[in-house]
């Protein structure tokens, strides 16, 4: 049996962050959506267990126990509690590393879905979500891979308001933005607004309305510290904010990927093509968010 699953990029339309609690964790509130660009995870029968990487960023990720796909397999085996037939997991890595796109968590979620399909189809969604949550703060959200609100440490999930079609351009400057370093830089400041959720509309009718509400009521609290650590992020933000197609420009997660919401797919396509010509050293992808 050969199986394949898509692992979509996660985008934080907003990310509000509070100060660390007694255990060092930061409370958050975030509206997460998922793109139609991402990685792919494949599962194949094998003579012995194996994990391989491919794709344009495959050589930049660890192949051992630090990889979330490997850890997902280990967690799945512990949950089954018995021997499993050998298999090979192949990660096609198309998303940049340390990019604020939840790539590792999304890859792990795709791997868990494949392993359930192949080895334990009776395993419940709740069981699978518990495994995903054990792998990281956004593990459960990336397993669901649909628009949602995340609160607490990222484990309290609820449905997002009804969103319009959102066309966007993702841009990464080719510089990693390690999450731990960004949070430490964030902790060095004062943050009176904390992780409070903004009043949420029941629905947003258009991309223009969504962008206006996001700009007025929300923010990404990690954007400023990430820019201080990696000025190339600021360069991307400045370029995107100067383009006529950009309705809203913001960094996703802890960076370094930034996004511009556009009014239509045609406008997103035009912006992406122009950026690819202007800055061939940047990773640029047009996408739809949902």
Curated annotation (Swiss-Prot):
Keywords: ATP-binding, Isoprene biosynthesis, Kinase, Nucleotide-binding, Transferase. This is 4-diphosphocytidyl-2-C-methyl-D-erythritol kinase. Its EC number is 2.7.1.148. One of its GO terms (biological process) is terpenoid biosynthetic process. PANTHER family: 4-DIPHOSPHOCYTIDYL-2-C-METHYL-D-ERYTHRITOL KINASE, CHLOROPLASTIC. ATP binds at residues 96-106. The keyword ATP-binding applies. NCBIfam families: ispE, PRK14608.1. InterPro entries: GHMP_kinase_C_dom, GHMP_kinase_C_sf, GHMP_kinase_N_dom, IspE, Ribosomal_Su5_D2-typ_SF, Ribsml_uS5_D2-typ_fold_subgr. The active site is at residues 10, 138. Pathway: Isoprenoid biosynthesis; isopentenyl diphosphate biosynthesis via DXP pathway; isopentenyl diphosphate from 1-deoxy-D-xylulose 5-phosphate: step 3/6. Belongs to the GHMP kinase family. IspE subfamily. The keyword Lipoprotein does not apply.
């Amino acid at each position: 049996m050969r199986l394949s699953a898509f692992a979509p990029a996660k985008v934080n339309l907003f990310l509000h962050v509070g100060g660390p609690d007694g255990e060092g964790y930061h409370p958050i509130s975030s509206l997460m959506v998922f793109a139609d660009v991402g990685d792919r995870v494949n599962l194949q029968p094998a003579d012995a267990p194996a994990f391989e990487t491919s794709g344009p960023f495959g050589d930049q990720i660890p192949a051992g126990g630090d990889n979330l796909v490997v850890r997902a397999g280990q967690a799945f085996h512990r949950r089954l509690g018995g021997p499993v037939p050998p298999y090979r997991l192949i990660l096609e890595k198309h998303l940049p590393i340390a990019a604020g796109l939840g790539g590792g968590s999304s890859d792990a979620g795709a791997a868990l879905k494949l392993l359930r399909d192949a080895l334990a189809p009776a395993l419940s969604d709740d069981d699978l979500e518990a495994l995903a949550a054990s792998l990281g703060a956004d593990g459960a959200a990336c397993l669901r891979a649909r628009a949602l609100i995340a609160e607490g440490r990222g484990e309290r999930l609820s449905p997002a308001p009804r969103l319009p079609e959102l066309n966007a351009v993702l841009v990464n400057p080719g510089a990693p933005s390690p999450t731990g370093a960004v949070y430490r830089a964030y902790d060095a400041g004062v943050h009176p607004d904390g992780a409070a959720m903004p009043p949420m509309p029941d629905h947003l009718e258009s991309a223009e309305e969504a962008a206006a509400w996001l700009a007025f009521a929300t923010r990404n609290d990690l954007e400023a510290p990430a820019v201080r650590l990696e000025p190339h992020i600021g360069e991307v933000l400045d370029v995107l904010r100067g383009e006529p197609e950009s309705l809203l420009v913001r960094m996703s997660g802890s960076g370094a990927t930034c996004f511009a919401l556009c009014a239509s797919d045609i406008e997103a396509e035009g912006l992406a093509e122009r950026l690819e010509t202007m800055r061939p050293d940047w990773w640029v992808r047009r996408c739809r968010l949902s």
